[in-house]
């Protein structure tokens, strides 16, 4: 299964509570921090919530 590299590129200052919680669930706390997550519906839903705060790249497993 494919994996996604998710990098936070914008601050959560001024972001709504749900967006902050979505970033925390993804494991992101600081700008330029990256995590690799499995590509599934749950992860895609979290990314959709914060698409304006993150960059997403597909990583070959």
Curated annotation (Swiss-Prot):
* Keyword Ribonucleoprotein set for record: yes
CDD domains (UniProt xref): Ribosomal_L30 (cd01658)
- What GO CC terms are in its UniProt record? cytosolic large ribosomal subunit
Instruction: Give the Gene Ontology MF terms in alphabetical order.
Output: structural constituent of ribosome
Quick check: keyword Ribosomal protein in the entry? Answer: yes
Ordered alphabetically, the record's keywords are:
Ribonucleoprotein, Ribosomal protein
Q: List the disulfide bonds.
A: none
Which terms does the UniProt entry file under GO BP? translation
NCBIfam families, per database record: rpmD_bact (TIGR01308)
Please give the family membership noted in the entry: Belongs to the universal ribosomal protein uL30 family.
Quaternary structure note: Part of the 50S ribosomal subunit.
Q: What is this protein called?
A: Large ribosomal subunit protein uL30
């Amino acid at each position: 299964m494919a994996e996604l590299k998710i990098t936070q590129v914008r601050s959560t200052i001024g972001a709504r509570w749900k967006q902050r919680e979505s970033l925390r669930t993804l494991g992101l706390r600081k700008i330029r921090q990256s995590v690799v997550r499995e590509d599934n519906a749950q992860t895609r839903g979290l990314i959709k919530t914060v698409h304006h705060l993150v960059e997403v790249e597909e990583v070959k497993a």
